[in-house]
């Protein structure tokens, strides 16, 4: 049954991580128009490259089992391809695709940490520096300090000490912004720009301050839906105990 499902669809989920770190390195503020335009170009290139590769493999190995051109051509993705790369569109028409789906932006929380504390998926920097909780690493008990990869690189490049406060770092590099400081409508706009070129969904969590209201959360979901996002999550700081990532040890949630 599993083999049949795989042959029927051959779904892939090509993605990325380190978006926030890349924007910091390029001096682009997360959520700004320039940052959104840049990420749109990145995702457009990823989509067209993935489609070209899948089409080339279909020429040699055949399409996925459930492939039907009549259904495929109705996809919004194919409307984009027809506009952006007419030659690729015709090749897909002639030869089909090897894979039913191609792109997906996963959270990559653990993967990005293991690769060097890069930012996860398309998320903004959670914190310039933060404490992470673990229960499985030997010789590390409970919580340990982690610096955003791009921030550490900036400090080392400018020969600045790692003991600068977060506020001092932001003052020196004003394009750096933490997730709680990114307006939620800017978060949704960036995700919508990327979603345009992603055939699967995007994992994205809007981190809200403790005083966020139900109306704020409602607006996030409405904006995401209206802009074409396939999914989004809202997390209010302090809404549950034992957060894996802690903003402030002294920050207390309501007991209500």
What does each of the following model-derived ranges do?
Residues 78, 91-98, 103-255:
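Catalytic alpha/beta core of large soluble enzyme barrels
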Residues 18, 29, 70, 84, ...:
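Poly-acidic low-complexity segments
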Residues 21-24, 28, 44-63, 127, ...:
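Generic secondary-structure signature for well-ordered alpha-helical cores
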Residues 1-3, 7, 29-108, 116, ...:
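Internal maturation/activation junctions in enzymes
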């Amino acid at each position: 049954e599993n083999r049949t499902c795989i042959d029927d669809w051959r779904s892939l989920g090509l993605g990325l991580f380190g978006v926030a770190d890349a924007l910091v390195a390029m001096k682009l503020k997360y959520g700004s128009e320039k940052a959104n335009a840049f990420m749109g170009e990145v995702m457009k290139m990823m989509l067209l490259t993935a489609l070209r590769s899948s089409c080339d493999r279909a020429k040699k190995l055949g399409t996925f089992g459930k492939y039907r051109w009549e259904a495929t051509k109705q996809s919004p993705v194919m409307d984009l391809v027809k506009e952006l790369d007419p030659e690729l569109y015709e090749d897909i028409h002639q030869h089909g695709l090897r894979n039913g789906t191609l792109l997906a932006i996963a959270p990559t929380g653990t993967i990005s940490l293991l690769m060097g504390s890069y930012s996860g998926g398309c998320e903004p920097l959670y914190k310039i520096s933060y404490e992470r909780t673990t229960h499985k690493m030997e010789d590390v008990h409970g919580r340990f300090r982690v610096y955003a990869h791009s921030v550490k690189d900036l400090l080392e490049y400018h020969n600045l000490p790692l003991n600068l406060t977060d506020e001092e770092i932001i003052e020196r590099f004003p394009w750096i912004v933490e997730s709680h400081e990114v307006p939620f409508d800017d978060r949704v706009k960036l995700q919508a720009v990327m979603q345009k070129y992603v055939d699967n969904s995007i994992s994205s969590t809007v981190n809200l301050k403790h005083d966020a209201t139900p109306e704020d959360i409602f607006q996030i979901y409405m904006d995401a839906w209206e802009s074409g996002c396939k999914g989004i999550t809202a997390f209010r700081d302090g809404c549950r105990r034992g957060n894996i990532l802690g903003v402030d040890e002294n920050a207390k949630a309501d007991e209500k």
